[in-house]
């Protein structure tokens, strides 16, 4: 009798084991142990880093701890172009650069950098999370990249060591470091500044040595990188809304199972709202903190901002004429929709 009971127990345990194996194929079969090298340019106290950490927590939870994200902040894996090449080559798995860095491989990403295109965060999110943002993302796989959505970097503002910027004329003659991106170059040329393209990692040294007079970045970047130590004036030009884009190496992506890809997409989607919230709260705090560190802060009168928009308009029209007309039409339609 005992033998029969033990046999039945053994059979039921085996059946239960099989049922369990079938119920959790995610962890048992098609999720492998993986280490994902996630590089970015920002410091560990910057909102982009908080986004990486939240993404890592979510992905670890979804994969039963099998998919681990290893963060490399502060340009440890190279500048934006070096990290982009590493993703394309499959050497690095993930990065979160500014969308501006992609204009060299998909020129239509320049649309995101058009000056004074959006007036607030709600408009920015609607533009990037909607059809335009997705149409741009669809251009990346053929370039060796997969994008999982957009994070917040913030509205860009000018700092310099010479004078407050209260009107467009105040930019005249200033050597302003810009992202190596044609839209930024031509925008600041329109303001009669002297734009100097330069990798982000070299920027602090260039400001310190006075190789350049100023730069333009969101408040949280200005604070996190201690630019207030080498820049006296912070001016709320709000000339461009900047976003980061969560990128994955296509070579790495193609090596993942559908389930692993699903977990990565879900973790990216769920971390996006958190990252944006943290980033926007940090930007609000940063202005006061910059003033406390001795920076002179000024806002621009709406009339002067409107003048800047008019000066930049021919730049927008010139670049729009050089892009894929279908994407430009989509951009125009979307801008009209989000401004309603």
PLM regions: where:
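Sec/Tat signal peptide C-region and signal peptidase I cleavage site
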Residues: 24-28
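Hydrophobic alpha-helical targeting segments used for export or membrane insertion
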Residues: 18-22
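Bacterial N-terminal signal peptides that target proteins for export
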Residues: 2-16
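N-terminal secretory/targeting leader peptides
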Residues: 29-123, 131-134, 138-340
